[in-house]
Swiss-Prot record:
Top EC class for this record: transferase
Organism field: Solanum melongena (Eggplant)
Lineage: Eukaryota, Viridiplantae, Streptophyta, Embryophyta, Tracheophyta
Residues that coordinate or bind an anthocyanidin: 18, 146, 360
Alphabetical list of PROSITE patterns matching this protein: UDPGT
Its job: In the presence of other necessary color factors, this glycosylation reaction allows the accumulation of anthocyanin pigments.
Name assigned to this protein: Anthocyanidin 3-O-glucosyltransferase
Alphabetical GO biological process terms: anthocyanin-containing compound biosynthetic process
Transmembrane spans: none
Length: 433
């Protein structure tokens, strides 16, 4: 079996939007490697089908389907049950990586793993005699919080001081997997054990850029606790090849500059019916032009007659081309769940945000948007109400503060562009592992 040809493994966490950033990483580092390099991408069949349908053919990527833990004939589980079954099947990943080496006849040169999986795969790089790199798809702040899970869990106060943070954090800002009383749950257990083992990775790469780390202590602390740390972002995800069948861009072309509200809450979040109603009432009252990405199961919770009454200034679609929408000059504000990918996309296109976080690192991300980067607002009271949405929209479209927030995000957009231009050197370093 040869070692002269490069062969790099990428091991994906198949839930949420984790797998797509890992594929984006492949696309970003591949230009710096010989054209003969083999990229082996390990992921569940359903996730592979989804992410590879959105990108052009990748001839240099070999796709391997790993078992999702669901026995043949059983119903497909959702949520935590699906994660639990997949975690139980991760022991088989070692076997399929060995099979990939046998199939290609080329030993692995490096193993990239989603950081979520690191606790299950920590021994794999040594077994395969290759360096191991963990990919944290979020920002440095959320990673820093996970590394101090034990300290946070021992805290009995509503605010706490975490090494690396110059200011205190509210316990409400902390991801619930960190503060969970039961560390035996699939997510909390996985992330806790990840934090305990991440220092064993030869490097940790983050989908972030230095200018987002307003607190330099965070990066210093990460460098102290981990072997090597690289910011490689913003890796804005590839635009989907799916056609804009709903005509969002054509509709935006007819709107005034920075006048449109774009609402989207990711592929996982389901808005409570009462909050859907509150959003609808606020949009109808304000008559602000809007595009709302709302799946069909949410449309049924709209007020009766809403679609007809707002058809002259609003558009509701079951799927929206988010990158193209955020890049459009007519979009003035982004109402978001504060998933990390959405935040990076908002920053990269200079669109300020109204934040309604739901789970994971979203509350911490939301705090960063409002209090640290000052490029958006958290919704009043933490949930959508008619008055809270109207107040937030008034801030962006009628008040001086909205102008300041817009200027701040434009400044970060420029920093993001600079980071992209400077990222060649970092990507070259990563490609040499």
């Amino acid at each position: 079996m040869t070692t002269s040809q490069l062969h790099i493994a990428f091991l994906a966490f198949p839930f949420g939007t984790h797998a797509t950033p890992l594929l984006t990483l492949v696309q970003k580092i591949s230009p710096f490697l010989p054209s003969s390099t083999i990229f082996s991408f390990f992921n569940t069949s359903s996730s592979n089908s989804s992410i590879f349908s959105k990108v052009p053919n990748q001839e240099n990527i070999k796709i391997y389907n790993v078992w999702d833990g669901v026995k043949e004939g059983n119903d497909t589980p959702f949520g935590l049950e699906a994660i639990k079954l997949f975690i139980q099947s991760t022991l088989l990943i070692s076997k399929i990586t060995e099979e990939a080496e046998e199939e290609t006849g080329v030993k692995f040169s490096c193993i990239f793993s989603d950081a979520f999986l690191w606790c299950f795969l920590v021994k794999l790089p040594k077994k395969m005699n290759a360096p191991g790199v963990a990919y944290w798809t979020g920002g440095s702040c959320s990673l820093a919080v996970h590394l101090y899970t034990d300290l946070i869990r021992s805290n009995k106060e509503t605010s706490l001081k975490i090494p690396g943070f110059s200011s205190t954090l509210s316990i409400n800002d902390i991801p619930p997997e960190v503060t969970a009383e039961d560390l035996e749950g699939p997510m909390s257990s996985m992330l806790y054990n990840m934090a305990l083992n991440l220092h064993k990775a030869d490097a940790v790469v983050l989908n972030s850029f230095q200018e987002l780390d307003r607190d330099p202590l965070i990066n210093k602390d990460l460098q102290k606790n981990l072997q090597k740390v690289f910011n490689i972002g913003p890796l804005v995800l590839q635009s989907s090849r799916k056609l804009d069948e709903s005509g969002c861009i054509q509709w935006l072309d007819k709107q005034k500059e920075k006048s449109v509200v774009y609402l989207s809450f990711g592929t996982v979040t389901t808005l409570p019916p009462n909050e859907i109603g509150s959003i609808a009432e606020a949009l109808e009252t304000k008559k602000t032009p809007f595009i709302w990405s709302l799946r069909n199961n949410g449309v049924k919770n709209l007020p009766k007659g809403f679609l007809e009454r707002t058809k002259e200034f609003g558009k509701i679609v079951s799927w929206a081309p988010q990158l193209e929408i955020l890049a459009h000059k007519s979009v003035g504000v982004f109402v978001t769940h504060c998933g990390w990918n959405s935040i990076l996309e908002g920053i990269s296109f200079g669109v300020p945000m109204i934040c309604r976080p739901f789970f994971g690192d979203q509350k911490l991300n939301s705090r960063m948007v409002e209090s640290v980067w000052e490029i958006g607002l958290q919704i009043e009271g933490g949930i959508f109400t008619k008055s809270g949405i109207i107040s937030a929209l008034d801030t962006f479209f009628n008040e001086e503060k909205g102008k300041i927030l817009r200027e701040n995000v434009e400044g970060l957009k420029e920093k993001a562009l600079e980071a992209v231009n400077q990222m060649m050197e970092v990507q070259q370093k990563i490609s040499r592992f």
